[in-house]
């Protein structure tokens, strides 16, 4: 008998829209997602391995691009007419929203990869009609091609927009290389609906690492919290969300007032007449969304946020008029034509002072958002706003600096900045590291220093732990942290609990003494920095541990790191880099949003590691004794400080049965199946390599009888990658 076939239940093409079979994540939604370690690979990159964006950008005629952008600002297109005959305000919003997703907690978001082109950002409610802004830019991107990335072009266009309306910007740096697929590692919130706010608990406590109040918003709801038009409540939301982007009160006021000096919001009619976002639109829309059936759907009939606000009398010219109007009128609550809460001057004041965006015969009164009034009624914001109102030069300088910080915050050290418009001034938020000012040590010096380090009495565990603690702060998201700068000896890092401050101080004292003696013995300008010596010490420890396991390895080393000063280290800015959970070191502190194993993969992604690299590093760090507090969890070996594959061999031993020691299931005992004797203890960060099928497959590679040499070799490669993660001055 022939089997029945059912087109509705049979296997489907895995790329079919809406008809693919259930994925593993559908069946097991709590399954650990290691796929975030394999995104942005060469398989999705059309540019090829030889493509070097930095070199392409250096050959770009930047002046020509800027000239073309200036021309575009007033070249209004019939298919999407420019408000007030000038696209500048639209492009400022585009650039702001490209950069404004950045959050300091994990360094994710921001403008650095051009993610506004992809879902979900291209379809967020707060990014309504920015699809048109990017389409307006396409002829310029098409003209200059690979020499300027979308990521750089979005920000440069925002700068040119400001300049074209009479504002002097602080500077611009290129160097943001595009990616070619949506980022899968960014947690945007738990909600399943746009504008929902399940991210709050308690007394409006916003979940970390989030930086926006509702799903699909960049920062705050302009109508006030959940649409409640309360300026003081809005101020609380503003302060929280902007702080999560590393902005203080002065920078916050400058950004809001500066941005709202220009342009308008769009709420000409019933928002229900607006169609779906780009990702949900029909194929013939060609990636555009929010098609509106209200009037012409564009120009004077455009609907975006639903608010219909024009702040100033000169919306395409830099001025202090935002503050003139903010303080010059008493405001009363009203509603836009789309029904959104906004504010207008009482008693009809200000009527006729503001131009219409598309009809020169019309005039209006100015209007404000609830979040604008927060700058007047919140005491701290009001003090700053009044000062800016009375001192326009201070306002302009503050906005220029805050805009530069907003648009460059996720680029990492200045060494990555490209182009002739990079300012010379060093800024505290740039994590400044001194330029190399001495002759670097050579290979012979490095060998001598390693021998001296090993003779100092420092153990393999101490050396490896210190080097790892120094380097593993790196975040590939915003290119912060890492071993360069030796900030592990400075506040706040030297006092982080995960770094075992007392033990760390002993190691650093010995390494500093070795560096001091070496430098004093030189007759020329040759020196070794502590930053280099910390990494070199870790390498020495690994080579010693490998030798103990019967392997001869040379851990690669490139000198050239420098030591930053405490004055070059913003304690408040560095605080979010402190790990509260670190599976690489089997460390957990307090309640976490993520499980230990999720946090381990998240940390690996920030370190730009692959799943094999994550696996081999955890196995190696355990046997080398790198656990915080010298915990024995996961140290599955009888030969500690030996670079063996024992972690994997013993984890996968079927003679061991694992059981949780408490209902929390965070610590486990591995008992001999026959005798019941406790052989090992481990955490979720250990047992996940035997539990998760993909990680177990990798663990099996390193547990085989012929894998000892491969394990040592692969560990060294992965270790070196982490040690050099922040070395933007060297190739590879």
From Swiss-Prot:
It is an enzyme of class 1 (oxidoreductase). Its EC number is 1.11.1.21. InterPro entries: Catalase_peroxidase, Haem_peroxidase, Haem_peroxidase_sf, Peroxidases_AS, Peroxidases_heam-ligand_BS. Its cofactor is heme b. Keywords: Heme, Hydrogen peroxide, Iron, Metal-binding, Oxidoreductase, Peroxidase. The record marks 93 as: Transition state stabilizer. The active site is at 97 (proton acceptor). There is a cross-link at residues 219-245 (Tryptophyl-tyrosyl-methioninium (Tyr-Met) (with W-96)). One of its GO terms (biological process) is cellular response to hydrogen peroxide. Heme b binds at residue 260. GO terms for molecular function: catalase activity; heme binding; metal ion binding. It catalyses: H2O2 + AH2 = A + 2 H2O; 2 H2O2 = O2 + 2 H2O. Coiled coil: none annotated. There is a cross-link at residues 96-219 (Tryptophyl-tyrosyl-methioninium (Trp-Tyr) (with M-245)). Residues 1-24 are annotated as: Disordered. GO terms for cellular component: cytosol. Bifunctional enzyme with both catalase and broad-spectrum peroxidase activity. Homodimer or homotetramer. PANTHER family: CATALASE-PEROXIDASE (PTHR30555:SF0), HYDROPEROXIDASE I, BIFUNCTIONAL CATALASE-PEROXIDASE (PTHR30555). This is Catalase-peroxidase. It comes from Mesorhizobium japonicum (strain LMG 29417 / CECT 9101 / MAFF 303099) (Mesorhizobium loti (strain MAFF 303099)). The lineage of its organism: Bacteria, Pseudomonadati, Pseudomonadota, Alphaproteobacteria, Hyphomicrobiales.
């Amino acid at each position: 008998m022939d089997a029945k076939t059912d087109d509705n239940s049979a296997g489907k093409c895995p790329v079919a829209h809406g008809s693919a079979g259930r994925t593993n994540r559908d069946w097991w939604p709590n399954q650990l997602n290691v796929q975030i370690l394999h995104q942005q690979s060469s398989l999705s990159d059309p540019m090829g391995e030889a493509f070097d964006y930095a070199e392409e950008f250096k050959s770009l005629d930047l002046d020509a691009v800027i000239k073309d952008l200036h021309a575009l600002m007033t070249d209004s297109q019939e298919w999407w007419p420019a408000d007030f005959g000038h696209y500048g305000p639209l492009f400022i919003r585009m650039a702001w929203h490209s950069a404004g997703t950045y959050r300091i907690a994990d360094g994710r978001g921001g403008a650095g990869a051009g993610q506004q082109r992809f879902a979900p950002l291209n379809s967020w409610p707060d990014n309504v009609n920015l699809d048109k802004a990017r389409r307006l830019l396409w002829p310029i991107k098409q003209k200059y091609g690979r020499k300027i990335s979308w990521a750089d072009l979005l920000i440069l266009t925002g700068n040119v927009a400001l300049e074209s309306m009479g504002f002097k910007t602080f500077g611009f740096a290129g160097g943001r290389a595009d990616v070619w697929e949506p980022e899968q590692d960014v947690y945007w919130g738990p909600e399943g609906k746009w504008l929902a706010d399940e991210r709050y608990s308690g007394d409006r406590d916003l979940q970390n690492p989030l930086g926006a109040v509702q799903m699909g918003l960049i920062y705050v709801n302009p109508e006030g919290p959940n649409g409640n038009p309360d300026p003081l409540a809005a101020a609380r939301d503003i302060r929280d969300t902007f702080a999560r982007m590393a902005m203080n009160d002065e920078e916050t006021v400058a950004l809001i007032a500066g941005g709202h000096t220009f342009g308008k919001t769009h709420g000409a009619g019933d928002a229900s007449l607006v169609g779906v976002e780009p990702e949900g639109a029909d194929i013939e829309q060609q990636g555009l969304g929010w098609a509106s059936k209200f009037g012409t759907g564009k120009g004077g009939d455009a609907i975006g946020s639903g608010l219909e606000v024009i702040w100033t009398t000169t919306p395409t010219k830099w001025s202090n008029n935002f503050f003139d109007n903010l303080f010059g009128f008493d405001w009363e609550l009203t509603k836009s034509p789309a029904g959104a809460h906004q504010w207008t001057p009482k008693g009809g004041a200000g009527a006729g002072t503001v131009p219409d965006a598309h009809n020169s015969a019309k005039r209006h009164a100015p209007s404000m958002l609830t979040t604008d009034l927060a700058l007047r009624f919140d005491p701290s914001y009001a003090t700053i706003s009044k000062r800016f109102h009375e001192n326009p030069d201070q306002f302009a300088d503050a906005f220029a600096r805050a805009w530069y910080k907003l648009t460059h915050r996720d680029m990492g050290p200045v060494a990555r900045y490209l182009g002739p418009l990079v300012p010379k001034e060093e800024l505290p938020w740039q994590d400044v590291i001194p330029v190399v000012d001495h002759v670097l040590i050579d290979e012979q010096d490095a060998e001598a220093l390693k021998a001296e380090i090993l003779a100092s009495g420092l153990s393999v565990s101490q050396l490896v732990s210190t080097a790892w603690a120094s380097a593993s702060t790196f975040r590939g998201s915003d290119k912060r942290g890492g071993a360069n700068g030796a900030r592990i000896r400075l506040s706040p890092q030297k006092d982080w609990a995960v770094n075992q401050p007392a033990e760390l101080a002993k190691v650093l004292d010995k390494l500093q003494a070795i560096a001091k003696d070496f430098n004093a013995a030189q007759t020329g300008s040759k020196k070794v920095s502590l930053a280099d010596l910390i990494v070199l010490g870790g390498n020495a420890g690994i080579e010693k541990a490998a030798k103990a396991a019967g392997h001869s390895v040379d851990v690669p080393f490139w000198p050239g790191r420098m030591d930053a000063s405490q004055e070059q280290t913003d304690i408040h800015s560095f605080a979010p880099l402190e790990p509260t959970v670190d599976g690489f070191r089997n460390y957990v502190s307090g309640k976490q949003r993520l499980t230990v194993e999720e946090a381990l993969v998240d940390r690996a992604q920030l370190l730009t590691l692959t799943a094999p690299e994550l696996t081999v590093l955890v196995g190696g760090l355990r046997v080398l004794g790198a656990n915080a507090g010298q915990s024995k969890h996961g140290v599955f070996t009888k030969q500690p400080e030996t670079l063996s594959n024992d972690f994997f061999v013993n984890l996968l031993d079927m003679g061991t049965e694992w059981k949780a020691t408490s209902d929390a299931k965070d610590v486990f005992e591995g008992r001999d199946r026959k005798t019941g004797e406790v052989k090992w203890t481990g955490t979720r960060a250990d047992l996940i390599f035997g539990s998760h099928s993909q990680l177990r497959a990798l663990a099996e590679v390193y547990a085989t009888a012929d894998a000892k040499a491969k394990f040592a070799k692969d560990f060294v490669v992965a270790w070196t990658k982490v040690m050099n993660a922040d070395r933007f001055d060297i190739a590879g």
